[in-house]
Every structure is written in structure tokens, then in C-alpha cells.
A protein has these predicted regions:
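A structural signal for short, hydrophobic/glycine-enriched beta-strand patches
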Residues: 1-150
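Start-of-domain marker
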Residues: 2-33, 180-229, 233, 241-242
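Mid-length scaffold segments of soluble, non-membrane domains
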Residues: 39, 64-74, 86-89, 96-102, ...
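A transmembrane-helix-recognition feature enriched in membrane-embedded lipid enzymes
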Residues: 150-177
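Short, low-complexity, Pro/Ser/Thr/Gly-rich segments in the mature regions of secreted, periplasmic
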Residues: 167-179, 354-363
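Terminal leader/tail segments of proteins
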Residues: 231, 246-249, 322
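Acidic, glycine-rich flexible loop segments
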Residues: 294-331
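Extended, aromatic/histidine-rich regions of cofactor-dependent oxidoreductases associated
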Residues: 330-364
Length: 364
């Protein structure tokens, strides 16, 4: 299937083989394309041992090796998305293109073989009638397309795609906004999981770990609540910097200087909650941490599934009267891991009347 349209954007399906990537680049240069998007799936099998996080990243590396110098945009679906992946890559591609209205509303998909017809239809469903979408199908070298029924792989590919195309044509009528929302939550979940893996790696590093040296041999990762998007709350932010600097109590004789910077007000479990936000005076000019604010808090899980003395959150300084407070990122004070640390105690006004089943759990 070859039905290209006049366009300056090429979308390459990231699963295609190297010969197709090479052919696509030759066409990209010949027809003077300006923008390149590569779609792909996350590589979830043996992910700790593979070089690339997705098929799009792997394809992009091949494209770079072939001498491509322009920007490459990767439309990769999250690890949490397991169904309707071709349509979801279409939604992910649309999310990229919506950020670049100057690219226009036309593009060509570069695919391989019989799958290209269904890809084209899926992308048309994802983009709607406002976009003009073309398709360029390279030859599938795994079987003879003129005699596809002579081999098992040819028969399987053609028959499967034929049935799938009928299904999409007759029965698949998705709502773009619903799929976009699922992708956004999936990207968020992937980002939190990535941060948690990095945190585990930090704790396992003997040169950096807050754990005692003799505890490292028994460390197999921190324990976390499952990631739940509902614990990423939009809060009202009230700036309040009129109070003087004060010495915050810790579990030791140390008295670090803080000031109240404001308050966040939000609802969780249908309960109105309020937390005071603090600024560390010693860090306010620090290039890494100067733009962050500190929220120590306690909730109904403390002493049961989370650290008895409470947990912490950091947020960037709000630039408006609202801010995201993400309890999935709640972390323990270092005192939860070793007695040698000095940690701020949670002020009494920051005790929540609800259970926050999010973030890190008690270390055992």
C-alpha cells in the first residue's frame, strides 16, 4: 500500500528492520522532509539488561548511525499500555504534533508490509479528519508478497492483518480523549517507577547510601505503595512569608533554620487538608535545591505501614496560586534508616486526618 501525501513530516514505525530504516532515510532526504517521528513500544522483557528502553530508541540509534543529524521525536507508549498499541502510538504521535502546530496537518507514515494498511487506518482514527495522512509501505522481506500463501509466516501475517483490519473498520471506534488520558497516566507511572529504581540504586551504592554499612548486604530495595494517580493532587497555594526565620526541631540537638513559605490546601478522600510549606534557609541559594520547598507531614499510616515519625515531600516553588502535591513521591527521613542522621520533626500543624497510602513505606 503506497498512498503518500504532500507533507514535511515523516512518521516511521519503530519496529521496522534496518533495511527499511535506511530506505526511509533516503526517501526523507530525497523528498526534503523536515521533521521525523519514530513510534515504538517499550522494551519490557529483560529491561535491566537491554541497551534501549524502547523500539523507538533502538531505531533512532540506527538512524543516527546512518548519518541522520536532524531532531528525532519518539512516540513511545507507556509500559502500562498492553492493548490497542498501534492506535495508542497514533495517539502518542498526535500528542507530539499538537505541540508543533507549525508542522502543519499532514504527514506520511513509513511502515512495512501488510501491517501498513491497518496502521494507516488506526492513525486516521487517532487524528481525525483534520489531518491528511499518507502511507508508504516498504517490502516485507520475510516472505514473497506475490505468493504469500506459500509460507507459514506469509499466510499468518496476511490472514491476521486481514481479520484485524476488518475488526478495526467495523468495530473499533475509540474516543481519543480517553486514550490520551490513559497515556498521560501511563507516562506518569513510568516516570515514578524510574525514580524508584534510581532511588534503590542510590541506596545500594555503598559510597552514597544512607544505610549503615553492615545493613547494605541485606538491602533488596525499598518498599513502596502501588502508584495511584489520585494521590497526585492539585492544591491551592497560599504564599505566606511574613513569619520570621525559626529553628526547626530535630531528633538531635541540631536546629536548622527554616521559614514558613506558605500553605497548600487540597482535598483527599473527600477530606479538606492543609499543610504548611517550609523553606530551608541554608539551601535557599543552593544551585540544586534553592528552588525547592519542604513539606514534612504525618498521616494515619504512621506507625503501621509507614515510618512512625512521618515522611517528607519536596515541591518546586509555585509560580501561581496552585501546585501539584504528589504523595507518590513521599520519602522517609534518613533517620528511618540509621541512627546517625539528624532529621527535622514534623510540626504538629502538619498532621493529616487521613491515611496517605502512597509513597515509600516503613523500612524493615
Amino acid at each position: 500500500m503506497n498512498e503518500p501525501v504532500e507533507a514535511k513530516t515523516m512518521v516511521i514505525e519503530g519496529w521496522v528492520e534496518d533495511y527499511a530504516l535506511k530506505n526511509a532515510l533516503e526517501l526523507y532526504k530525497r523528498d526534503h522532509y523536515k521533521h521525523l517521528i519514530i513510534t515504538g513500544l517499550p522494551l519490557v522483557h529483560f529491561e535491566d539488561y537491554v541497551m534501549f528502553p524502547s523500539t523507538a530508541a533502538a531505531a533512532a540509534a540506527v538512524v543516527r548511525k546512518l548519518g541522520f543529524k536532524d531532531s528525532i521525536y519518539e512516540a513511545v507508549i507507556p509500559k502500562t499500555v498492553f492493548i490497542d498499541r498501534t492506535y495508542n502510538t497514533g495517539v502518542a504521535t498526535r500528542m507530539i504534533m499538537s505541540k508543533h502546530p507549525d508542522w502543519g496537518r499532514s504527514f506520511n507514515i513509513y511502515s512495512v508490509g501488510v501491517h501498513s494498511r491497518r496502521t494507516h487506518l488506526m492513525f486516521e482514527r487517532a487524528f481525525g479528519s483534520d489531518y491528511n495522512i499518507g502511507i508508504i509501505a516498504d517490502t516485507d522481506h520475510s516472505f514473497d508478497p506475490e505468493h504469500w500463501w506459500h509460507t507459514s509466516i506469509g499466510f499468518r501475517n496476511v490472514s491476521n492483518e486481514f481479520v484485524a483490519w476488518i475488526y478495526v473498520s467495523a468495530f473499533f471506534h475509540p474516543t481519543y480523549s480517553d486514550f490520551k488520558r490513559k497515556l498521560e497516566i501511563g507516562y506518569y507511572t513510568d516516570s515514578i517507577n524510574k525514580e524508584r529504581k534510581e532511588e534503590d540504586a542510590f541506596f545500594a551504592d555503598s559510597a552514597k547510601s544512607p544505610l549503615e554499612k553492615d545493613s547494605l548486604k541485606d538491602f533488596h530495595g525499598l518498599s513502596w505503595y502501588p502508584i495511584k494517580y489520585k494521590y497526585r493532587v492539585m492544591a491551592k497555594f497560599d504564599l505566606d512569608t511574613v513569619n520570621p526565620v525559626f529553628e526547626m526541631a530535630t531528633n538531635t540537638a541540631r536546629k536548622p533554620e527554616y521559614r514558613i513559605y506558605g500553605h497548600v490546601i487540597f482535598k483527599i478522600h473527600d477530606t479538606l487538608c492543609k499543610l504548611t510549606v517550609y523553606q530551608n534557609i541554608n539551601l535557599k541559594n543552593d544551585p540544586q535545591w534553592g528552588n525547592y520547598l519542604f513539606i514534612p507531614f504525618r498521616d494515619k499510616t504512621n506507625g503501621f505501614t509507614t515510618h512512625a515519625a512521618g515522611r517528607y515531600l519536596d515541591i518546586e516553588k509555585p509560580v501561581s496560586d496552585s501546585v501539584i502535591v504528589d504523595f507518590n513521591k513521599a520519602y522517609n527521613p534518613y533517620c528511618a534508616y540509621a541512627d546517625r542522621w539528624s532529621c527535622p520533626l514534623v510540626p504538629i500543624e502538619n498532621r493529616l486526618p487521613v491515611a496517605i497510602k502512597a509513597g515509600v513505606k516503613e523500612y524493615k
